[in-house]
């Protein structure tokens, strides 16, 4: 239904898309800050190559890489607007971008059946569900040092580290608890 509706928009859909693009670029230009406009443009381009043919990267192995921009670009737009660039901010941008990519892998696990049936070439379909799951878990654990670094760089309270440690312990416990179901051949 949704695809049929989108197709039926035809030229009107293209006009709406161009109007929104022009509005977004105009808002970027109004700020008078070139980097804001550049990051808005990058975000729009990433969205287009993610969704539209001939690229349609959402159905490819590159989907998590494109999703890095989904998390990182909004933070970069705000940072550009306030002209705040620092090592701390870049680490935060990296964490948010990589977290968005990791979330993309989790979504691919949930969509495995439909992606496999529709012959999408996502990372999870290419590697298989079990390997895709293991990669996703590994990526999640690799984000932990970055989360700790962000906590240190931004001088977050002890509560942040307690909550982070509790979440890691809980998720690790659940993985161990269900290892036979999750990791059986």
List the predicted regions and their residue ranges.
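Multi-pass alpha-helical membrane architecture of UbiA-family
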Residues: 1-185
């Amino acid at each position: 239904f949704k695809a049929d509706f989108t197709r039926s928009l035809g030229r009107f859909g293209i006009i709406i898309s161009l109007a929104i693009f022009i509005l977004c670029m105009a808002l970027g230009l109004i700020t008078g800050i070139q980097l804001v406009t550049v990051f808005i443009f990058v975000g729009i381009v990433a969205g287009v190559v993610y969704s539209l043919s001939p690229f349609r990267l959402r159905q490819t192995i590159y989907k998590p890489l494109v999703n890095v921009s989904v998390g990182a670009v909004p933070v970069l737009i705000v940072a550009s607007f306030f002209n705040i660039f620092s090592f701390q901010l870049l680490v935060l941008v990296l964490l948010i971008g990589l977290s968005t990519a990791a979330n993309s892998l989790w979504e691919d696990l949930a969509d495995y059946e439909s992606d496999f049936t529709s012959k999408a070439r996502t990372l999870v379909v290419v590697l298989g569900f079990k390997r895709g799951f293991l990669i996703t878990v590994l990526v999640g654990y690799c984000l932990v040092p970055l989360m700790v670094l962000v906590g240190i760089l931004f001088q977050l309270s002890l509560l942040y580290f307690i909550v982070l440690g509790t979440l890691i312990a809980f998720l690790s416990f659940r993985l161990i608890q269900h290892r036979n179901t999750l990791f059986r051949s």
